[in-house]
Amino acid sequence: MIDIPPYPPLDPSNYDLIVVGTGVSESVLAAAASSSGSSVLHLDPNPFYGSHFASLSLPDLTSFLHSNSVSPPPSPSSPPLPPSNNHDFISVDLVNRSLYSSVEISSFESEILEEHSRRFNVDLAGPRVVFCADESINLMLKSGANNYVEFKSIDASFVGDSSGELRNVPDSRAAIFKDKSLTLLEKNQLMKFFKLVQSHLASSTEKDDSTTVKISEEDMESPFVDFLSKMRLPPKIKSIILYAIAMLDYDQDNTETCRHLLKTKEGIDRLALYITSMGRFSNALGALIYPIYGQGELPQAFCRRAAVKGCIYVLRMPITALLLDKETGGYKGVRLASGQEIFSQKLILDPCVTVGLESLSSLTDQQNETLSVLVPKSMINKEKIARGVCVIRGSVKANVSNALVVYPPKSLFPEQLTAIRVLQLGSGLAVCPADMHVLYLSTLCDNDDQGIKALLSAMSNLISLPVPENRQSDSVVENDTSETKPILLWRALYVQELVKGEFGGTISSMPSPDGNLNYNEIVESAVKLYEKLMGSEELFKEETSPAENTTEEENDGGVEIED
């Protein structure tokens, strides 16, 4: 239970929009609505910004996961009652559903970690990076939120397998020629494929495309994996393209278990995002960047932009009930944990907020219709994502600090149905102390056991557990390639439910963090909802001045995000 400090009454008590939760989608929406001139109240029950996209210290991450994991069902809600000060409304109690399950947290070097625990900024929804050309960057530039966040490059990307070998992802002409793991034939095949993709992309932007080679419409509608086979690419190259560049999750060669068989046109779009991200910013080493101090900086950047435009922020303030019109059933406002009643035209809610089923039985059809987006819906195929966070001493790859590792389906064990992604981040990003790294792991799964098994397999492939009888800080274990594996100091494993956003007329619910590596779908959900709320009004129509749209980045390799 969150202790609510005494708050003075909010003034005003009427707004155009109330937003609950400071995740990425909610924060983008609050910033956009504030920029359009709407009055916005932005609340969060937590004492920090970011909600499920927050970056936290180790103690705070531990506390959040335990307090928000699956717990016994709450006692039945009391029936809706009219607020004491206005009998034209009824109040409907809200409850929080748990997004997390199978939470397991282990510490192997407690004294060292306790000494440095507040020097960690650990992502709750990792691994996640930003493509230099993705929509989140475009929105940051358009809104001016880029003034409040700094980035650094991801140094390298690798593909892993059960042998423990990490192979570089050949994602550019220079990388292909430098790659010693590819034969001359494979290099030529990969270069030919990339040239075809670039020619196709060029033909779609040029008026006179008679001299460019274009992929046929028939091929564009075929499965991407079949198109790669048609191009006579060997399995190793196909795997790199599918899972380490296009960033697919499911085994594209197994139609029985693949839930999303990608078409070639979608695959080309994914490759286009990767290709256009390479070199977009002069001091970015590759396609991927990451915010200094953690991904929690992204929602905070949009919150700061919203505050400049007049949005009012209150943390540590849950809402406890919705206020509905007794006659029409329409939404009118919310009751805060402080007891104050606040009114608005529209309401946007965190994915955890829902109504107890017991509360619905005594409501009218109109009232139930208003609340329909908040009623938990059973899903036939309930997809989840298993996440892991590790603090390690050492690096998974010598002389590399910030790196992405992808394990394609079946690369670690035969039953591995989905790709496993691992992101290593170092102290240069201000996420951990020097000489340590933070690893984030994730994989889609149908159930908790399946997901945790996959994560543990990737962990054992990359890192070594300390020997219980000899937990000396400098102890290391050698792998089969005579290289030393990093030592695990701390670990968190958990499974997160994937909740889709529900868009209603006056009440909408935002999605939970998804299973993607980037923010495109998360940002897209905010853009779609904004269009429904504001109609044809342009998102962030006010342009920032050139001086305001530039970061003052003069330090250790930071990436300047500017037009």
Swiss-Prot record:
Acidic residues bias: where? 550-563
Database matches in SUPFAM superfamilies: FAD-linked reductases, C-terminal domain, FAD/NAD(P)-binding domain
Protein location: Cytoplasm
Which molecular-function annotation in GO is an example for this chain? GTPase activator activity
Q: Which UniProt keywords apply?
A: Cytoplasm, GTPase activation
Q: What is its main location?
A: cytoplasm
Which InterPro entries does the record cross-reference, listed alphabetically?
Answer: FAD/NAD-bd_sf (IPR036188), GDP_dissociation_inhibitor (IPR018203), Mrs6 (IPR017230), Rab_escort (IPR001738)
| UniProt key word Cytoplasm | yes
Q: Which GO terms describe its cellular component?
A: cytoplasm; Rab-protein geranylgeranyltransferase complex
Where do the record's region annotations for Disordered lie? 538-563
Q: In which tissues is it expressed?
A: Expressed in roots, leaves and flowers.
**Pfam family of the protein (one):** GDI
Could you give a single Gene Ontology term from the biological process aspect? pollen germination
What does this protein do, in the record's words? Substrate-binding subunit of the Rab geranylgeranyltransferase (GGTase) complex. Binds unprenylated Rab proteins and presents the substrate peptide to the catalytic component composed of the alpha subunit RGTA and the beta subunit RGTB. Preferentially binds the GDP-bound form of Rab and stimulates geranylgeranylation of various Rab GTPases in vitro.
On subunit structure and binding partners, the annotation says: Heterotrimer composed of the alpha subunit RGTA, the beta subunit RGTB and REP; within this trimer, RGTA and RGTB form the catalytic component, while REP mediates peptide substrate binding.
Hey, which family's this protein in? Answer: Belongs to the Rab GDI family.
| Family matches, as PANTHER family | CHM, RAB ESCORT PROTEIN 1 (PTHR11787:SF4), RAB GDP-DISSOCIATION INHIBITOR (PTHR11787)
Q: What is this protein called?
A: Rab escort protein 1
Q: Which organism is it from?
A: Arabidopsis thaliana
Q: Which gene encodes it?
A: REP
